[in-house]
Design a protein with these regions (language model features):
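Hydrophobic h-region of N-terminal signal peptides that target proteins for export
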Residues: 10-19
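Extracellular polysaccharide-degrading/modifying enzymes targeting complex plant/algal/animal polysaccharides
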Residues: 21-131
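Secondary-structure boundary elements
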Residues: 148-239
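Hydrophobic/aromatic-rich core segments of domains that either
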Residues: 211, 249-317
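Alpha-helical and coiled-coil interaction segments, frequently adjacent to or embedded
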Residues: 281, 294-388
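Short beta-strands within extracellular/lumenal beta-sheet-rich domains
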Residues: 382-412, 449-452, 524-533
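Exposed low-complexity, polar/acidic, P/S/T/G-rich flexible segments that act as propeptides
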Residues: 413-416, 462-466, 473-537
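Conserved Ser/Thr-centered positions that define the repeating blades of beta-propeller domains
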Residues: 428-434
Length: 537
């Protein structure tokens, strides 16, 4: 619901060489009411006492303990009638009483005092907040620019979407957008070139790699078991999370690429990495954000820690809050520890090829789909995003086969076009390797035809980054036509540039997908930043 509408157009001079014209940024804003809905996930609901249940929340809205909650709890589509109830009343009487107590905790009962985890109803905590919707559009017609988006607020802001459009009608491009000061996340070589400096010692290199993993990932159930998340570029850009073994193996992969010997220890309950230099091994644990120095000053190895666990137990807890006595036992129970030194592939590249007319959308608020082949009964990660790539497929022949490749894990793919009864329907088939094509049915939904590839993708049981699409048309229906393709993919929000409350300086580099120089008449790309700023009373 829009309360007022304002449009502000202004020019910002980017940090370019003086000979270049100023970069134009169009900024619009409007005031609206934002509806915030958080569905209570059964895996985050716990029985408390009597009829009371607690639910973990992540939307960050103020609760009654520190103010007055403006949230309403819905059971299916009906609001429960008794908010801000006493906890004793929720426990003893129930019948839909609830209390949004803190930003992270809801106390509630169901309308009939049934178990919300098993009664097959949907519980949603809903609120409305006045916000300012901001949109900044940047048109770029040169291969490298730096520009600044001045959010101009001290409040927390919510990034909605980042959109990148290739507006050129004939040139495929590879854009690389980052925040000024970020490492190059597009390849493992780029990561190392960003975090390693000339003249670094082997220990300094090891520490830089360890610190990079500490900063750019978090601990959560991985998408797959195995090497899918053991490529540093996939680990950081696609997922951003994993277990201790995933962090350790990515440490080892980067260390190997940096010219260091590395290996991984399994401690039967934990996994850590080691690098070899100065005639000995040294342990680095990015998952627990720790390493340990000996009295002699060097970083201890796993075997040294097993022999001298007091290096671990000097503090009661480690940097992430784990009991150091329990951690020490993992090292000292040497009979079930094992070590492995092997080369891990680190070849994935974030090569975002945008064909003419392509639109790439990172939706920071969309968490509908996720890739995971294991731990399906466990909570979803606290941070992940869904994006879309929209591409217009140009059909000119009776039969055409095209490869669809994308550096983010593909969650869904679909084609949709207007239904014309007189026109013969094309046939669609897909394949992983260009052989053994499997036909995908065409369905009609109202005035459009739809081809959905999601089930085929899911049936493969692993992360997919490419597939071949074959389209066959009746000769009578041949001739040039366009059919839109939409890919849904998963991305790690931490690794995608976003507007910050204090403002952000962005760096954009664009190169031609064919490796040649961009044409002199290149029409450029458009970058759109969308974010919201809360209006406080």
């Amino acid at each position: 619901m829009t309360l007022r509408l304002e449009l502000i157009i202004f020019l910002i001079t980017a940090a370019l060489c003086p000979a270049e014209p100023p970069l134009q940024i169009e900024h619009g804003e409007r005031t609206s009411l934002r509806r915030v809905e958080e569905v209570l996930r059964p895996d985050r609901i716990r029985h408390e006492i009597g009829y009371a249940y607690t639910a973990g929340l992540s939307a960050g809205r103020i609760g009654d303990k520190h103010g007055r909650s403006e949230c309403t709890l819905f059971e299916d589509r009906k609001p429960l009638p008794l908010p801000r109830a006493l906890h004793a009343s929720i426990r003893k009487v129930g019948k839909g009483r609830y209390s949004h107590w803190t930003s992270g905790t809801l106390y509630f009962s169901t309308s009939d005092n049934s178990d919300p985890r098993t009664n097959k109803r949907r519980y949603t905590l809903v609120s409305e907040q006045a916000v300012i919707d901001h949109v900044s559009r940047v048109r770029v017609d040169r291969p490298a620019v730096t520009y600044r988006i001045p959010a101009g607020t001290n409040q927390s802001i919510t990034n909605r979407r980042l959109i990148i459009r290739n507006t050129d009608p004939s040139t495929a491009v590879i854009p690389r957008l980052s925040i000024e000061g970020w490492p190059d996340l597009s390849s493992s070589e780029g990561i190392l070139a960003s975090i390693l400096k000339p003249g670094m010692t082997a220990e300094e290199k090891s520490l830089a790699i360890w610190k990079f993993l500490v900063d750019w990932r978090f601990h959560h159930y991985p998408a797959e078991q195995g090497d899918e998340v053991h490529d540093p570029v996939r680990f950081i850009n696609v997922y951003g999370y994993g277990f201790c073994d995933d962090s350790a193996r990515n440490t080892a992969a980067l260390a190997q690429l940096a010219g260091l010997r590395s290996r991984v220890w399994g401690l039967s309950g934990h996994v850590v990495a080691e690098t070899y230099y100065a005639g000995r091994w040294h342990m680095f644990d990015p998952d627990h954000e720790v390493y340990y120095r000996t009295p002699a000053g060097h970083i201890a190895s796993v075997e040294e820690l097993a022999a001298n666990p007091s290096l671990i137990t000097q503090t009661k807890t480690d940097p992430i809050g784990s009991d150091t006595r329990a951690i020490a036992r993992l090292y000292t129970t040497t009979e079930d520890n094992s070590v492995r030194e092997r080369k891990v592939s680190a070849t994935h590249k974030m090569r975002l090829v945008l064909h003419p007319g392509d639109e790439l959308v990172y939706d920071f608020q969309n968490h509908d789909k996720i890739h995971r082949t294991t731990f399906n009964d466990r909570p979803l990660p606290p941070s992940f995003g869904n994006g879309t790539l929209t591409r217009s497929l140009s059909l000119t022949d009776h039969e055409c086969t095209m490869s669809i490749e994308w550096p983010y894990v593909i969650l869904d793919a679909s084609l949709q076009w207007p239904a014309h009864d007189a026109e013969p329907l094309p046939k669609f088939a897909v394949s992983l390797e260009g052989t053994n094509f499997e036909e995908i049915p065409v369905t009609r939904q109202g005035q459009v035809y739809v081809v959905r590839i999601a089930e085929w993708l899911k049936s493969k049981g692993k992360a997919l980054y490419r597939f071949d699409l074959q389209i066959t048309r009746d000769s009578a229906g041949s001739g040039r036509r366009q059919i839109p393709l939409k890919l849904d993919f998963q991305f790690a929000p931490r690794a995608v540039p976003r507007v910050q409350a204090t403002g952000s300086s962005f760096q954009l580099k664009v190169e031609s997908a064919n490796g040649r120089a961009l044409p002199a008449d290149w029409d450029g790309v458009e970058i759109v930043h969308e974010w919201q700023e809360p209006i406080t009373p």
